[in-house]
Curated annotation (Swiss-Prot):
Protein name in the entry: Large ribosomal subunit protein bL25
Record GO biological process: translation
Pfam families with a match to the protein in the record: Ribosomal_L25p (PF01386)
Keyword RNA-binding listed: yes
């Protein structure tokens, strides 16, 4: 099982997302279950390397959010139109 350390994101919107991407990170969201949705930020290079491995899209991943482990699956991925960059990922709780 794959474990990914993430950080909670407080700033939202286009400007905040652009600043994240300039810092080699990108926004994501975790939703589903009985808990509220959480906006998070992921390291781009680490996530891109994990994405290339088989099973990234169909296996259960573990996100460490503020020291708490959350089991999720990838729901949707958004990519840059012509660069090999991830721009956003939706995770759904399992």
């Amino acid at each position: 099982m794959t474990t990914i350390n993430v950080e909670v994101r407080n700033d939202q919107g286009k400007g905040a997302s652009r600043r994240l991407r300039a810092a080699n990170k990108f926004p994501a969201i975790v939703y589903g279950g009985s808990e509220a949705a959480i906006s998070i930020a992921l390291d781009h290079d680490t996530t891109k390397n994990l994405e290339l491995k088989p099973g990234f899209y169909d296996s259960v991943l573990t996100l460490v959010i503020d020291g708490k482990e959350t089991k999720v699956k990838v729901q949707a991925v958004q990519r840059h139109a012509f660069k090999p960059k991830l721009t956003h990922i939706d995770f759904v709780r399992v």
